[in-house]
């Protein structure tokens, strides 16, 4: 293999842990791991380590959990490790300019889109939401901007009509490590070819919110069906019935025009719950009332038929 690099890894969720795992199998020397501080989780609000911390401790790696990398003493933690490169994957902290310049080869980031499309916090979800035909991962050289650095390597994958953010996340968690290992080899060999991002092609992947995930029946059925897949597994598309939130796990588009007002229930039977939208009909197939498990439309109709009387409107 190429020269073994001294690497600092910075990441937090499972997506990042899969990249750390690949690094540890690659023959490079991971000299330190930075991850977010333990956070309260679950009903008991017990402090829980990140997936990256769990893996790093299993492998006996030094772990650092600063709240910020702005203080001088925390930047010194990075400097003391004398790394060739810092690999950043869904870390969640901003790296100041001083930190970006510490490693000999700088800092590189694995981003879950084909940059410059979908810079920002929710690239996987936004690619689905927008109806993109493909997405992928970009390995880039980090600079002080938000996902603005030169691109070093890209891998793409198609987005299917069945993909959710959950399935795309898994696909990119397979692609990312492949791209990362290839990029590190090129950096070690001096064969990397940085490519400047075309600013005319930039789009921004804004954070998702629970309020955005509320179903807006004035949108087209096609857009709503994409939203349902984009917001799965979080924050989950939802509607409100009798003051209760009901999550929607799966729906299909019926490409038939209707004069009914958006939100009007047209049919409710074993084929699904058919609702008029701003364009076409959305057929709700799998739903989850508050406090219950997800169930088919037919099962929900068996217990709550009064919720879905044809002619009534969902708000």
Swiss-Prot record:
The keyword Transport belongs to this UniProt entry's keyword annotation: no
Domain of life: Bacteria
Binding-site residues, (6S)-5,6,7,8-tetrahydrofolate: 113-116
Keyword flag Transferase: yes
SUPFAM superfamilies xrefs: FMT C-terminal domain-like, Formyltransferase
Matches recorded under InterPro entries: Fmt (IPR005794), Formyl_trans_C (IPR005793), Formyl_trans_C_sf (IPR037022), Formyl_transf_N (IPR002376), Formyl_transf_N_sf (IPR036477), Formyl_transferase-like_C_sf (IPR011034), GART_AS (IPR001555), Met-tRNA-FMT_C (IPR044135)
Catalyzed reactions per annotation: L-methionyl-tRNA(fMet) + (6R)-10-formyltetrahydrofolate = N-formyl-L-methionyl-tRNA(fMet) + (6S)-5,6,7,8-tetrahydrofolate + H(+)
Name under which the protein is recorded: Methionyl-tRNA formyltransferase
Organism: Escherichia fergusonii (strain ATCC 35469 / DSM 13698 / CCUG 18766 / IAM 14443 / JCM 21226 / LMG 7866 / NBRC 102419 / NCTC 12128 / CDC 0568-73)
Lineage: Bacteria, Pseudomonadati, Pseudomonadota, Gammaproteobacteria, Enterobacterales
Annotated gene: fmt
């Amino acid at each position: 293999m190429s020269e073994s690099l001294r690497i600092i890894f910075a990441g937090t969720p499972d997506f990042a842990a899969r990249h750390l795992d690949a690094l540890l199998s690659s023959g490079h020397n991971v000299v330190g791991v930075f991850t977010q501080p333990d956070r309260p989780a679950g009903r008991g609000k017990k402090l829980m380590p990140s997936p990256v911390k769990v893996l790093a401790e299993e492998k006996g790696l030094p772990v650092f959990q600063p709240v910020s990398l702005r203080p001088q003493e925390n930047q010194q933690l990075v400097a003391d490790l004398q790394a060739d490169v810092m690999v950043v994957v869904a870390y969640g902290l901003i790296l100041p300019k001083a930190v970006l310049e510490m490693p000999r080869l700088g800092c590189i980031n694995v981003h879950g889109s084909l940059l410059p499309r979908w810079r920002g916090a929710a690239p996987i979800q936004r690619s689905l939401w927008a109806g993109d035909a493909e997405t992928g991962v970009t390995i880039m050289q980090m600079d002080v901007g938000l996902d603005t650095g030169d691109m070093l390597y890209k891998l793409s994958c198609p987005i299917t009509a069945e993909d959710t953010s959950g399935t795309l996340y898994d696909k990119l968690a397979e692609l990312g490590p492949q791209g990362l290992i290839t990029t590190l080899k090129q950096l070690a060999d001096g064969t990397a070819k940085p490519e400047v991002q075309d600013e005319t092609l930039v789009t921004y992947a804004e954070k998702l919110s629970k309020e955005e995930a509320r179903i807006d029946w004035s949108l087209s059925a096609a857009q709503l069906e994409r939203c349902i897949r984009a917001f799965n597994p979080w924050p989950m598309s939802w509607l409100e019935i009798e003051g209760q939130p009901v999550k929607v796990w799966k729906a299909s588009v019926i490409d038939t025009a209707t004069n009914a007002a958006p939100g009007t229930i047209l049919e409710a039977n074993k084929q699904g719950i058919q609702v008029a939208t701003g364009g076409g009909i959305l057929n709700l197939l799998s739903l989850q009332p508050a406090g219950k498990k997800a169930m088919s439309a037919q099962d929900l109709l068996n217990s709550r038929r009064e919720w879905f009387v044809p002619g009534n409107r969902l708000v």
